[in-house]
UniProtKB/Swiss-Prot annotation:
Gene Ontology cellular component annotations, sorted alphabetically: cytosol
GO molecular function ontology, one term from the record: rRNA binding
Purpose of the protein: One of the essential components for the initiation of protein synthesis. Stabilizes the binding of IF-2 and IF-3 on the 30S subunit to which N-formylmethionyl-tRNA(fMet) subsequently binds. Helps modulate mRNA selection, yielding the 30S pre-initiation complex (PIC). Upon addition of the 50S ribosomal subunit IF-1, IF-2 and IF-3 are released leaving the mature 70S translation initiation complex.
Gene: infA
Quaternary structure and partners: Component of the 30S ribosomal translation pre-initiation complex which assembles on the 30S ribosome in the order IF-2 and IF-3, IF-1 and N-formylmethionyl-tRNA(fMet); mRNA recruitment can occur at any time during PIC assembly.
Domain S1-like: residue ranges: 1-73
Protein's UniProt name: Translation initiation factor IF-1
Chief location: cytoplasm
């Protein structure tokens, strides 16, 4: 998995599934972010459901949106 330069990776829990493959994720520190699935997860048909533990990659420029890069088993 390629890491983005300067991106923050935080762990959280999916709170709700939204339309267009978007998810509301509550991070460990209590913040809620809007996240979408990364391209590789979409390619391999990895399904994400509410209450799944995930790793979210956040850009330092916009900390309210992120990309889900890993789903814990």
């Amino acid at each position: 998995m390629a890491k983005k330069e300067g991106a923050l990776e935080l762990e959280g829990t999916v709170v709700e599934a939204l339309p267009n493959a978007m998810f509301r994720v509550e991070l460990k520190n209590g913040h809620r972010v809007l996240a979408t699935i990364s391209g590789k997860m979409r390619q391999h048909y990895i399904r994400i459901l509410p209450s799944d533990r995930v790793v979210v990659e956040l850009s330092p420029y916009d900390l309210t949106r992120g990309r889900i890069v890993y789903r814990h088993k």
